[in-house]
Amino acid sequence: MTGPGAPLISVVLPVGNVADFLPACLDSVFGEPGQPGGDLEVIAVDDASSDGCGHILDTRAGRDPRLRVIHLTESAGPGPARMRGLAEAAGTYVWFVDPDDLLAGGALAAVTGRLASCRPDVLLIDYLIRRRSGRTEPSPGAALLAVPPAAAATLTLAERPALINRTMTAWSKVFRREFLTGLRVCFPPGIHEDVQVSCAALLSAERIALLDRVCYVYRRRRHSFLATTSMAHFSIFPAYESVFALMDAGGNPAGPGGPAAPGGPRLPRVSAAVRAAVFGRAIEHYSTILANGLVPRRGRREFFHRMAADYRRYRPAGYQRPPGLRGMKFAVIERGAYGAYRVLGPLNNARAAMARAWPARRAQPAR
């Protein structure tokens, strides 16, 4: 339970061998002028780093009492490190920040202001993508965060199903801590560990708030987990399969390959529009992994057919494919036509590249 005097936000950093990036991340969190000290605690979980991250954290903690460092003796990966940090957090809200990324200037002030004004279960924030060249670009679907002047302060996924198309990352959301722990879902080991938590939170939340300001800078790194070509990307399938099981069970979450968790929350009835949006998001996520060359060549055909099987298994009744090239891609996936998919892939990639080159609006950092 959150007690008197507890901070408003607990920032949780799962730290694993990112010494080249960690100081800048810490500066972005602690260096914001005018941030009330009592509103913030930072819990850094050193995931048995071997590159000096532990020393960087301990040195910083000696200068700033808002930072608490937990050292793990064996590396468990970012998912379990987040869970350890969550267990130690005292804040009303928790924000999982990756230590190779940055908070944008003014982010904490903007976030705390929105949290205080509408007390949501989940706050969705905007972000910038910083590529290795240093070039930045706005987040895909940033327009989804726009709030009409007369709109209510919070909403549900049923009211705006397209919100499921925002990134599945944990760092793009600020969670009410007791709401999150009440979901009885966890960040598992491995990659794509954010998917089940993100989906369960959005499906369950009665109060979702939107912050149409850039609060986070996501660094695209060559050697990050999600940018590495690996058979580990097959873990995306059990991640989404657990989400479909969650919707079918009415909100009693099951971990990938595991039984339903007793005592979990009951989801509101999942509308046809929400189910269709989650389905489309899953298929698009699968196909993006394949299109970006993240699956080794030897596993691509198998990955495609696993995607096609999920398409046929989870396609909602009456589902209408999207228009244009994306709809053609979905049709080819449904048929399991790998050869046609390989031909269509470059066209879809060109469409996506054009969308990135001509964004609907230019995102601005929070200030």
Cite the ranges covered by each PLM segment.
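Cell-envelope/extracellular polymer assembly enzymes that use nucleotide-activated donors
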Residues: 7-10, 41, 196
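Short, well-formed alpha-helical segments that are part of the catalytic scaffolds
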Residues: 17-33, 56
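Short beta-strand/loop segment that forms part of the nucleotide-sugar
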Residues: 38-48, 68-72, 99
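Glycine-rich, basic loop-to-helix element that forms the pyrophosphate-binding segment
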Residues: 72-89, 96-102
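Donor-binding/catalytic cores of nucleotide-activated saccharide
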Residues: 78, 99-211, 216-231
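Catalytic core of nucleotide-sugar-dependent glycosyltransferases
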Residues: 214-221, 227-253, 265-268, 285-289, ...
